[in-house]
Every structure is written in C-alpha cells, then in structure tokens.
Curated annotation (Swiss-Prot):
It comes from Aliivibrio fischeri (strain ATCC 700601 / ES114). This is Ribosome maturation factor RimM. GO terms for biological process: ribosomal small subunit biogenesis; rRNA processing. Pfam families: PRC, RimM. The lineage of its organism: Bacteria, Pseudomonadati, Pseudomonadota, Gammaproteobacteria, Vibrionales. PANTHER family: RIBOSOME MATURATION FACTOR RIMM. An accessory protein needed during the final step in the assembly of 30S ribosomal subunit, possibly for assembly of the head region. Essential for efficient processing of 16S rRNA. May be needed both before and after RbfA during the maturation of 16S rRNA. It has affinity for free ribosomal 30S subunits but not for 70S ribosomes. The keyword rRNA processing applies. SUPFAM superfamilies: PRC-barrel domain, Translation proteins.
Amino acid sequence: MSKQDEVIVVGKFGASYGIRGWLKVVSFTDQPESIFDYKPWLIQVKGEWVEFSVESWKRHKGLVCKLKGLDVREEAQTYTNLEIAVKADALPELSEDEFYWRELFGMEVVTTKGYALGVVDDIFETGSNDVLVVKANLKDAFGKKERLIPFIDEQVIKLIDREAQRIEVDWDPGF
C-alpha cells in the first residue's frame, strides 16, 4: 500500500454528547486537540473508509465534536467506538532523524556487534523515554522471547536505516 493510500488511526469516538449529534472524541495524537488539524477524517462504515468533515469541536471534560450531516443523538450513537483515521500523507513530514512509531514496526533490530535480536513488535511510552518491544528470533541463543529496549537516541539507538528496515542498538543480547 502506498503512503497515499495508507490509513492511520488517530483516535476513536466515545459516547454521544447531547441531543444534536455531538460525539466525544478520544485522541491518540500527542497533543489531543491536534486531531482536529487533520482533514478529512476517515471513518469505517460497513467495512469501507468514508470521508467526514468536522463541523465544530470544543473542549468539554475532554473533546467533543459535531460531524457535518450528523444531527441527531440516535444517529451519533451508532458511531460510538468507531475509529477515526486519516490518510498517511495528511501527517506532517518529519526530518530525517524523526520517525513515526508505525515506521519502526517490523524493523529488524541488531546489536552493534551484528547479533540479530529480533523485530520491533510494539512500542510504548514511559515517563522518561519510549521503549521498543522486540520479538526475539525463534533460535535466540539466550532463550529470550522478547526484549524491552529503551529508545534512547545515541546512547542505545545507534542507527535507524529506513531503507534496510534495520535498527542498530548498543545492547547486551543476554539482557
């Protein structure tokens, strides 16, 4: 799938709000309000991604929005828990040394000495830094199933090669 066709989930709808078709919004973006900067929104309706425009939004114990054409509570309730997505090319371009998490999934992780640790299976945030969850190779000499590797640039993460789909780390394979 090309970047132009790729769909990225940026949030989801919560419960309906009020009687005029407003919905609560759960944003997955770093700055929650920035979800409204992405246009148009794509919402999966009966297995197909359909474009929607936000008519209005506001903060009210979180975020709520009104979609164009959605005017009654009962109709809004059918959108509860549906994902909000945008086309990948709607996301801002990053500099060469910045990455979206989605770009790192599936990349091979190797030590600076060439030992293959596995592939990036997940990433999560901690208070101080992100952590790569690396699913170990089946024949891992150290018997590991997964490794948690802190995403600390230059100290642990030595190189990220987008073309080769490879991350080089300064990490002890036994840990």
